[in-house]
Amino acid sequence: MITPILRRQLLRSARQTRCFSSAPIAAAQEIKRLGVIGAGQMGLGIALVAAQKVGVPVTLVDTNQASINKGLKFADKLLAKDVSKERITQEQSDKIRSLLAPTTSMDSLADVDFVIEAVPEIPSLKFSIFESLAQICPPHAILATNTSSISITRIAATTTKDPTDTSTSSRVISTHFMNPVPIQKGVEIITGLQTSQETVDTAIAFCKAMGKIPSQSADSPGFLANRILMPYINEAIICLETGVGSRDDIDAIMKNGTNVPMGPLQLADFIGIDTCLAIMKVLYEETGDSKYRPSVLLRKMVDAGWLGKKSGKGFYDY
């Protein structure tokens, strides 16, 4: 039976689905300054693509100066590669680089129109950040998260002490970019119960202006991409730990048999072993379904500090 509540949810879902084709790109022009929290691979990628494609100044925040330095070095490397391949000129590269304004202070986000959080997948960390953003950012700013598995409704709830006051929580949304951001076109748009249609429209328009192709997912554990992808990676790890196949054979059969650019174990290294574990934990804890239980080897690798490409060692050595 379709209850009144379910009917409203279905109608809202239909409206949000339609907006993907109707949202005007011009809305992105209202974003005069972007904020990005986290200078890691994801955050830096988002900041760089926004500066290059949309041409907006980007305040890049990370409390760790070493992370900022590493991120900017990576940005310089990517821009230099684009120049060498004649995708952009040196003048364009310099312009893009000048749009990135790194800082260790969250208070620097006081003048942004749109902020995207891209820190590690730790619920308490994200909740704390959004609680701060509610106090720092202007009242019109869109507060987006790049979370790959945590409930948007829960994140939005941290922005207010009064659940009936949705003036801030209505501006919270997920723009889950795919890694690596400069290459992958996909982005998941996930709304919480509080998210307004205006927030959805603005987020979609801005993502399109970045050259991305948005897809919508319900606010469900893992959303779409990781609900499908992570069990695939986890099962590959189980096959390795139980001796069903070697590392090379597992990756080879999936790469050559399904026409994907890399096998599941190499992909796990690229994503980050710790990130894979964090997402599997959320899926398992939120659903209670044993098919999402993280493999023993996955847990052990995180304990060992073998986090994949970013640590120099994972299923492969880098």
Give the predicted meaning of each segment:
Residues 2, 12-81, 85, 136:
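NAD(P)+-binding Rossmann beta1-loop-alpha1 motif at the extreme N-terminus of oxidoreductases
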Residues 2-32, 37, 54-55, 197-201, ...:
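NAD(P)-dependent Rossmann-like dehydrogenase/reductase catalytic/cofactor-binding core
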Residues 42, 175-178, 184, 254, ...:
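Methionine-biased hydrophobic packing positions in alpha-helices, especially
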Residues 59, 101, 116, 173-175, ...:
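Hydrophobic/aromatic beta-strand patches that form the interior of the parallel beta-sheet core
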Residues 59, 212, 229-233:
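Structural/interface elements that position substrates and couple domains in central-metabolism enzymes
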Residues 63-70, 80-143, 150-151:
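Rossmann-like NAD(P)-binding element
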Residues 142-218, 226:
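Rossmann-fold dinucleotide-binding core
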